[in-house]
Regions:
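Extracytoplasmic/secreted proteins, especially bacterial periplasmic and envelope-associated proteins
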Residues: 22, 26, 38, 56, ...
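Periplasmic OmpA-like peptidoglycan-binding domain that tethers envelope proteins to the cell wall
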Residues: 340, 345, 456-540
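Short, conserved micro-motifs composed of acidic
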Residues: 33, 92, 99, 103-419, ...
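Alpha-helical protein-protein interaction scaffolds
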Residues: 24-131
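Envelope-exposed proteins and targeting segments
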Residues: 149, 212, 417-421, 426, ...
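Bacterial Sec-dependent N-terminal signal peptides
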Residues: 1-24
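Periplasmic peptidoglycan-binding/tethering modules of Gram-negative envelope proteins
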Residues: 400-452, 513-515, 528-540
Length: 540
């Protein structure tokens, strides 16, 4: 009887193991086909998730913008298999953590990946440049199809735009996200930045393949755009994938002519996201062609007067990283804007700009960039407004924005003494009279949207240098605690005690001054930074 039970148990284990292998095989097939939505569901059904299952499940969530789920799966992956996990999973895990709001953990994995210290708070502070800070106010555009993905926006003439969308339900379903393939649309722009009269582009342009990211010449007679190649090509892993090429079409008798693939496109790699310089003499694009810095790089190529092209040039390491640089746009003042997840940023794709020789990339800050993908940025510099795409709401959506330039202004507030004493002799507690003054200061800090608040506190000359230094620091901390208790963020406040080293009068000795004169040095000074909009004077 015991042998019978053992046989039954072994049979059940074998059936279970066979079922597990079958589930993994099914999920792996979907993953290889880049059907990530279905792959995630299939991998979730696997009871005993090994390292490869966790890697692929995490990636399936990551590539479909389910960052909270991705972070949870990658966390389990690293808890179980940290010593054997390839570096690229650190990179994706760190981005998932950033999107999930776990910045300290994200810093840890970014630091491990890049092999250098990463401090997100320091990066945020570095974005504030007193000479060149722009604040963006973004608004999601209303759409008549909330389930579609909309991005790849571009200017089309004076009052029109073009964008890519999955809203055409007559197109084939794309396994990656289970939405229709992309088509190009056009629409009118209102003064408020709203889009209306949205219509499909010509059937000469749109096909059952993906079309996106159009770029138009200034006269509106030439368009460059992305289209997925019909032919699939085996990548280094032996997986058949469809790469992307740039096509060009000319307006003939009021209609778009048959598109032609530009000559440096290929079946073996992608060439995508065209953008024209203001004078139309240079075409910018993204590509993962061999010889770049890694993944997708940005390139430029001369467009000759006869319509032929020069030799593509990589924009170099100031712009390009080992990760993705995509969606270039060149404004009327020849500033290059682009999206990247390889430079340190606020999460996933961020928008950057570069001027001059493209030797440096500058992040546009967190009034524009989110912890998710922000990309396809376009702007009319003179009007200080434009558009971008972002999946910060969970789906690719279009946003309009207005931009204002600010300077950082440092304001100093010193608590008035009059006949009052800031701190009693040898004390650091806040008196009721002083609380009333601090309440007024708090109102100023809140109304000014103050940042980088510093409290510097002082002592009189009575007592040892060491004791007075400690006493002044306690006074600074006491002042800070009062501000924090009344709604000022502790992270915005720093404190420093100067002891008796910075008197406001000549009372530098322990004797020789009146009590009122000594009292003037028992004080706190509060300084803070605030942003002041740059008002441009109208030229006459």
């Amino acid at each position: 009887m015991k042998n019978i039970y053992k046989t039954i148990l072994l049979t059940l284990i074998s059936i279970s193991a066979f079922g597990q292998k079958s589930e993994i095989k099914k999920a792996d097939k979907l993953f290889v086909q880049r059907a990530y939505v279905d792959a995630a569901d299939a991998y979730e059904d696997v009871a005993d998730k090994n390292q490869e299952v966790l890697q692929n499940l995490g990636d399936s969530y990551f590539y479909t913008n389910q960052m909270q789920n991705a972070a949870e799966v990658y966390k389990l992956l690293f808890l179980r298999h940290e010593q054997n996990v390839a570096p690229e999973y650190e990179f994706r895990f760190a981005h998932s953590l950033r999107a999930a709001g776990q910045d300290d953990e994200a810093d840890k994995y970014f630091a491990s990946y890049y092999d250098r210290e990463i401090a997100f708070e320091d990066f945020q502070a570095s974005i504030v440049d007193s000479s060149n800070l722009f604040i963006y106010e973004t608004t999601m555009l209303a759409t008549d199809n909330s389930t579609s993905s909309d991005f790849g926006i571009s200017y089309f003439g004076e009052d029109q735009i073009s964008f890519a969308s999955t809203r055409n339900t007559a197109r084939p379903i794309y396994p990656w996200n289970k939405k229709p393939t992309l088509d190009l649309y056009s629409g009118n722009i209102s003064e408020e930045g709203e889009i209306s009269n949205v219509v499909l582009f010509s059937d000469v342009i749109n096909t059952d393949e993906h079309e996106s990211s159009a770029a138009f010449s200034q006269d509106g007679q030439t368009v460059y755009f992305d289209r997925t190649n019909e032919k699939r090509f085996k990548d280094t892993s032996g997986i058949r994938v469809a790469h992307i090429s740039i096509f060009r079409s000319q307006m003939v008798d009021g209609a778009w002519g048959e598109p032609e693939k530009i000559p440096f496109s290929s079946e073996e790699y992608s060439v995508e996201h065209p953008a024209l310089s203001p004078d139309g003499s240079t075409l910018f694009f993204a590509s993962d062609m061999p010889g770049g810095e890694g993944s997708f790089d940005l390139y430029k190529v001369a467009v000759n007067e006869d319509g032929t092209f020069g030799t593509p040039e990589n924009l170099g390491p100031g712009i390009n990283t080992e990760h993705r640089e995509q969606f270039p746009f060149v404004s009327e003042n020849n500033t290059l804007y682009f999206a990247s997840d390889g430079h340190l940023g606020f999460g996933n794709l961020d928008i950057y700009k570069s001027e001059g020789d493209y030797s440096e990339a500058e992040n546009l800050g967190n009034s524009l960039n989110s912890p998710y993908d922000d990309f396809a940025f376009i702007i009319k510099e003179g009007e200080k407004k434009g558009f971008l795409a972002s999946n910060r709401s969970g789906n690719d959506n279009l946003y309009s924005f207005t931009r204002a330039q600010y300077i950082k202004k440092t304001v100093e507030i010193e608590i008035p003494h009059e006949d009052r004493i800031y701190f009693a002799f040898d004390k650091s507690n806040i008196t009721p009279e002083y609380q009333q003054v601090l309440d007024q200061i708090i109102d100023i800090l809140k109304s000014s949207e103050a940042t980088e608040i510093q409290i510097a506190s002082h002592a009189d000359a009575r007592g040892t240098d060491e004791y007075n230094m400690d006493l002044s620091q306690r006074r600074a901390e006491s002042t800070k605690n009062y501000l924090v208790e009344h709604g000022i963020a502790a992270s915005d406040i720093s404190t420093i005690g100067y002891g008796e080293s910075r008197p406001v009068n000549d009372c530098t000795d322990a004797t020789g001054c009146t009590e009122a004169e000594y009292a003037q040095n028992r004080r706190s000074v509060i300084t803070f930074s605030t942003m002041e909009e740059v008002v441009e004077e109208e030229t006459k």
